Amino acid sequence: MIFSTLEHILTHISFSVVSIVITIHFLTLFLLVDEVVGLYDSSEKGMIVTFFCITGLLVTRWIYSGHFPLSDLYESLIFLSWGFSLIHMVSYLKFKKRKNNLSAITAPSAIFTQGFATSGLLTKMHQSAILAPALQSQWLMMHVSMMVLGYAALLCGSLLSVALLVITFRKAIKIIGENNNFSFSFGKIQYMNERSNVLLNTYFLSSKNYYRYQLTQQLDRWSYRIISLGFIFLTIGILSGAVWANEAWGSYWNWDPKETWAFITWTVFAIYFHTRTNTNLEGVNSALVASMGFLIIWICYFGVNLLGIGLHSYGSFTLN
């Protein structure tokens, strides 16, 4: 009873704090004045509080359930929210003396995942249950934690790529809207990318263009670093899952929906790294691949659970 009450308190504190953090972040975004520096510092401290609250929540659930809290969708969503908070903490410690724009990605991601986890859709999963026989293995912590941390990093990196595309093609989207022409081929994207590079070189001395150039380069660099980290986690998760599958089901790979989409996710981001090796395709083109990967991750992590079929059906749920 005590642990359940403590978990309930920590859940609501973390959700409330991260909600305040998002509000403060948007205030600092739209009120570009020196007076909001204190507000920004408060938002950073708020994310630290959120991180420790979610950590306490997971530890509490681990203690009273007797197993690592990654046995169902509710627990994995809380762990995913913790992963977003962890990424924010790492970036905060690295750029303690500078403004951390990554919070624009990590804070909304944390509140979205935790908000869904604590919603009425997953009420039946809020109470810890006895671990399913298929999950009673030492591989649970290794496999599932690596997969969820991989999802968290890949989602953050993909969202940074989406932001890069929005900044790069803001004028192009405006032109398309005015002409009511929504056909946007890859060739046009390549042409506009080359055109933007020419304009950048021509107006390099312009402070506005130079700031945009710096911002896009920073987004591209951070996206690559975070996606690289997520890809490593995803690879470790898939390999450890294959070993676990061989022990549990007698086969390293069974091509059930979860495994198939995990392989598709891995392939998409492998293509992303391939585009990074080609100087003609890096930047905007690699960001397009990463943006596509954002949707693929959600299908793999969340969409497959809606089917409720396959060897990973214990993580499914129904929208009742």
Curated annotation (Swiss-Prot):
GO terms for cellular component: chloroplast thylakoid membrane. Pfam families: Cytochrom_C_asm. The chain crosses the membrane at residues 13-33, 46-66, 73-93, 102-122, 147-167, 226-246, 259-274, 289-309. Keywords: Chloroplast, Cytochrome c-type biogenesis, Membrane, Plastid, Thylakoid, Transmembrane, Transmembrane helix. Required during biogenesis of c-type cytochromes (cytochrome c6 and cytochrome f) at the step of heme attachment. Belongs to the CcmF/CycK/Ccl1/NrfE/CcsA family. This is Cytochrome c biogenesis protein CcsA. The gene is ccsA.
